[in-house]
Regions:
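Hydrophobic N-terminal alpha-helices or hydrophobic patches in metabolic proteins across all domains
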Residues: 1-218
Length: 218
């Protein structure tokens, strides 16, 4: 029993680590973008912005990049932290690994032309289903950790928007900023604030998921 318990623990840790994805941490990605933006390095900020987006992005003016980076950060945190933890609690290591494989399957479709549109649509739709509950719990945690009324208003106003935009606008709303109805001229300080908000929300979110597991989710 002892060795089985140790083996299960090791497997769980490895599965959770895998589900968080490889490469740099979110903190490192934010730091890379911030440093590049402050020294005015267009090529480096484009690369760092793509890392936060998890995919190649269209070139944009440096003045617009902090707002884009802030939106990408919320979605990146969902994919690399919040959703894997949720599925680990809900279904154990299999759930966390399954979620990560679903993320990789979608990425494969986005980067390989021979995957075909049907594959890409199916992979995106499947991942959207897996993100449905984590998105809502994460939005709640962001609202509780930040400006609740502004976050709630953003969530309601973007009801008909794609899931990623809805989540990012809710996160920006939790910072006390309005829904994007025009240029907001967000600064690099907003990205730092978003990163701090995510840390607070993560602690709250883990507590929410743990409470949910007591009622049959885990």
């Amino acid at each position: 029993d002892f060795f089985f318990g140790v083996g299960s623990l090791v497997f769980g840790v490895l599965a959770l680590t895998f589900s968080f994805g490889g490469g740099d941490t979110l903190e490192a990605e934010v730091s890379a973008f911030t440093l590049a933006w402050r020294r005015g390095d267009q090529a480096a900020t484009d690369s760092a912005l793509g890392a936060l987006a998890g995919a190649a992005v269209e070139p944009m003016a440096m003045e617009a990049q902090p707002e884009a980076a802030t939106g990408y950060l919320f979605c990146r945190a969902r994919t690399r932290l919040f959703a894997p933890i949720f599925w680990f609690v809900a279904l154990g290591p299999v759930g966390a690994v399954g979620y990560r494989l679903s993320v990789l399957a979608r990425a494969f479709g986005e980067t390989h032309d021979n995957a075909g549109p049907d594959y890409c649509q199916a992979a995106s739709r499947w991942l959207g289903w897996l993100d449905f509950v984590p998105d809502r719990l994460m939005a709640l945690a962001l609202a509780l950790a930040g400006h609740f009324s502004a976050a709630w208003q953003a969530w309601e106003q973007t009801r008909s928007e794609p899931a990623n935009r809805r989540l990012s606008e809710t996160g920006i709303g939790a910072l006390g900023l309005p829904v994007d109805e025009g240029p907001r001229d967000l600064t690099i300080a907003t990205l730092d604030d978003a990163h701090a908000l995510l840390r607070r929300a993560l602690y709250l979110w883990i507590a929410l998921v743990a409470i949910g597991s007591l009622f049959g989710l885990g």
